[in-house]
């Protein structure tokens, strides 16, 4: 009616959601999309007998993580898959990483994702990941830095080790701002750089961060290849509704890497304790299958291999995932979606803007009958090419978790 406020799509979806006993499983193969090397992408080069067996029973298509031509970070691309508009809900990597390793944060705290990196004598970053140092070495360096630098200009600083070269840095004090540029060139072969405040109010915070970077690099001179630090994703805890509030779901997450656990926790998922292997993640899914109605299962190895430019390694990771597929299907979820959060072609050694293939299984799909789970096969599916933001809607619909819209 005239004069009435028009509901947004998000509000409509929330009004249609109902709670049922159907089980939804979203399998995210991180960075699964690729580009051809000698005529084949990583998915096309992989030997995947189980994908080939199950794919004909699915409906398929291609999804754009954020929008046409935009290369997404892992945060925005996952948010979209979970049903959150990444342009509306912006969550910094620092907060995601911090929550993923159970670091307590207040609304005043500023968190950043950190890398130990290798700096040459000319101030050039020659390896952003310091050769992927062992996690044990990471813990040793973090303990050293934590004792060496406890505060800068009255701001308390805590460092927390992650996996391999990764860590989380938390600044605690009043008036800290998160509108800062990344202190990370994002590519090897470029000069190390500090952060800049994007507002007048953020300049003081930028000064504190840059002083920390200088002191940390001086302290790490004898720790080659981990002789400097890079920081990005400066962020504070945002306001965001939970998946339970939005979709009437009881969601749980199974992921081995902190960032993904942190993002899942932010949207209200229960974080399930799991092991480090794909097999252990699937065993966790089995163990808790009766307790929740939505499961997010994350597999990381494909993305790591892609970022390393390791085409064969990514193919091997895809084949490893293929081997555990029957165990997931054996659980008989009412809806199963298999896709990626973004593409990470080994030829680019980074995330890219290319769409990801998706398979959707339920009792209510019209199977496409495709022979393989690849970019080329999925582009001909009846789902077509659509935004990742709509994946959760399709899953809810196929799980009979949405009421009819309108009269």
Predicted segments with their positions:
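Feature captures the catalytic ectodomains and active-site-proximal regions of enzymes
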Residues: 2-407
């Amino acid at each position: 009616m005239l004069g009435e406020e028009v509901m947004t799509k998000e509000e409509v979806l929330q009004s249609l959601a109902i709670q049922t006993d159907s089980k939804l499983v979203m399998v995210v193969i991180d960075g699964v999309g690729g580009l051809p090397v000698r005529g084949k992408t990583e998915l096309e080069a992989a030997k995947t007998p189980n994908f080939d067996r199950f794919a004909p029973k699915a409906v398929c298509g291609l999804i754009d993580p954020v929008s046409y031509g935009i290369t997404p970070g892992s945060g925005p691309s996952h948010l979209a898959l979970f049903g959150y508009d990444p342009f509306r809900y912006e969550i910094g990597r620092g907060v995601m990483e911090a929550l993923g390793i159970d670091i307590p944060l207040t609304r005043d705290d500023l968190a950043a994702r950190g890398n130990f990196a290798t700096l040459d004598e000319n101030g050039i970053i020659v390896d952003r990941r310091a050769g992927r140092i062992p996690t044990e070495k990471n813990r040793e360096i973090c303990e050293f830095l934590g004792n060496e630098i406890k505060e800068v200009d009255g701001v308390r600083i805590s460092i927390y080790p992650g996996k391999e070269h990764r860590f989380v840095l938390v600044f605690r004090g009043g008036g800290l701002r998160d509108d800062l540029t990344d202190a990370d060139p994002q590519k090897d072969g470029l000069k190390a750089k500090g952060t800049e405040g994007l507002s007048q109010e953020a300049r003081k915070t930028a000064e504190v961060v840059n002083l920390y970077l200088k002191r940390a690099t001086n302290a790490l001179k004898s720790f080659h290849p981990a002789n400097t630090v890079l920081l990005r994703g400066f962020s504070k805890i945002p306001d965001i509704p939970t998946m339970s509030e939005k979709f009437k779901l009881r969601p749980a997450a199974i992921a081995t890497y902190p960032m993904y656990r942190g993002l899942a926790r932010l949207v209200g998922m229960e974080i399930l304790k799991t092991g480090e292997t794909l097999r252990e993640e699937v065993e966790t899914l089995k163990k808790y299958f009766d307790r929740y109605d939505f499961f997010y299962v994350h597999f990381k190895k494909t993305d790591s291999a892609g970022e390393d430019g390791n085409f064969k390694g990514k193919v091997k990771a895809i084949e490893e995932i293929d081997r555990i597929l029957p165990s997931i299907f054996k659980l008989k979820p009412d809806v199963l979606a298999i896709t990626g959060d973004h593409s990470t072609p080994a030829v680019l050694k980074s995330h890219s803007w290319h769409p990801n293939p998706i398979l959707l299984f339920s009792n209510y799909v019209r199977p496409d009958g495709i022979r393989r789970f690849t970019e080329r096969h999925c582009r001909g599916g009846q789902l077509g090419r659509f935004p990742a933001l709509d994946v959760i809607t399709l899953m809810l619909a196929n799980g009979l978790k949405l009421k009819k819209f309108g009269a």
